[in-house]
Design a protein with these regions (language model features):
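Active-site proximal beta-strand in glycosyltransferases
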Residues: 130-158
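Conserved donor-binding/catalytic core segment of Leloir-type glycosyltransferases
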Residues: 6, 223-251
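Nucleotide-sugar donor phosphate/pyrophosphate-binding loop at the beta->alpha transition
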Residues: 110-119, 155-174
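Donor nucleotide-sugar binding/catalytic pocket of nucleotide-sugar-dependent glycosyltransferases
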Residues: 151-155, 159, 173-191, 195-224
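A short, glycine/small-residue-rich beta-strand->loop->alpha-helix junction that serves as a flexible
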Residues: 9-22, 251
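Short hydrophobic "strand-cap" motifs at the C-terminus of beta-strands
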Residues: 8-9, 181, 203, 241-245
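N-terminal strand-loop element at the rim of the active site
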Residues: 10-14, 33-103
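Short His-centered aromatic/hydrophobic patch
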Residues: 91-96, 112, 132-138
Length: 253
């Protein structure tokens, strides 16, 4: 019988972690393992890139409320999740005032801690050999999934951001392995959680050459390129560049 692997992520919109997950899924041998992918909300440009060998689990409506507008989920009757998210923002505001740090991602852990208790269990899916929480926060895989081994991924260099270590430590500590994507990420993580060194394991992102070439050859909207037409030789016209990223030190913004 093939080993059963469960992988969880919020959505598959364009992002580094999401692209990394697609690379990992493409690298797995589906003749040797069964992979169930649980995407909380079936949205994002990378949904179409999920390999055919992956079993995409159906959406569970209540899990979609974690990232949708609060006003919208209140209209649908999810008062418990809405209240949890509002309470999480209040807790985070108090934490930021105490720590005097503006670049904090502590809010994500507060939201997870305040909403996960209201989410339905996923144990009806049976016991997995391995459950992977691919993106923070990791409470859902910790609390709602039954597995012999549980691994959590860390994609962010914690030396650039502020987190509430008191709140996060019990979550990270519950996992059998913590997978870091680089040496610098490992170093930053251990600067916050030195007691978890024995659980940390390095596994760099998997991105195949074929995937990069396929993405490079995809058609795109050339509106941006047309904006530069006629600029050759015009030294008085500045070059305009556009970059996209989360407004935080960890993304160099």
């Amino acid at each position: 019988m093939k080993p059963r692997i469960f992988i969880a992520i919020q959505y598959l919109e364009i992002g580094g972690a999401e692209r990394s997950l697609i690379g990992l899924l493409n690298a797995l041998d589906y003749m040797r393992c069964q992979v169930d992918l649980f995407v909380y909300r079936h949205s994002g440009e990378f949904m179409s890139l999920i390999p055919k060998g992956v079993n995409l689990l159906p959406e569970v409506k209540k899990y979609t409320t974690l990232t949708r507008p609060i006003r919208e989920i209140v209209r649908e009757g999810y008062w418990d999740i809405a209240a949890g998210r509002i309470w999480a923002h209040l807790l985070n505001s108090c934490y930021q005032r105490r720590s005097k740090r503006k670049d904090s991602i502590a809010i994500f852990q507060y939201i997870a801690s305040c909403t996960t208790p209201f989410l339905p269990s996923l144990e009806q899916l049976g016991e997995y050999d391995l459950a992977i929480s691919f993106l923070i926060p990791h409470n859902i895989v910790r609390d709602k999934v039954k597995a012999r081994q549980k691994w959590a991924w860390i994609h962010t260099d914690y030396s650039f951001i502020d987190v509430n270590t008191r709140v996060e430590l019990p979550v990270w500590g519950a996992f059998d392995r913590i997978i870091s994507i680089s040496e610098s990420v490992s170093k930053g993580f251990l600067s916050k959680f030195p007691s978890l060194e024995n659980k940390l394991m390095l596994m760099e992102n998997i991105l195949s050459e074929q995937f990069v070439r396929e993405q490079a050859e995809m058609p795109f909207d050339d509106t941006f390129l047309r904006a530069f037409e006629g600029r050759k030789g015009q030294t008085d016209q500045p070059v305009r560049l556009c970059t996209i990223g989360r407004f935080s030190y960890s993304k160099c913004y």
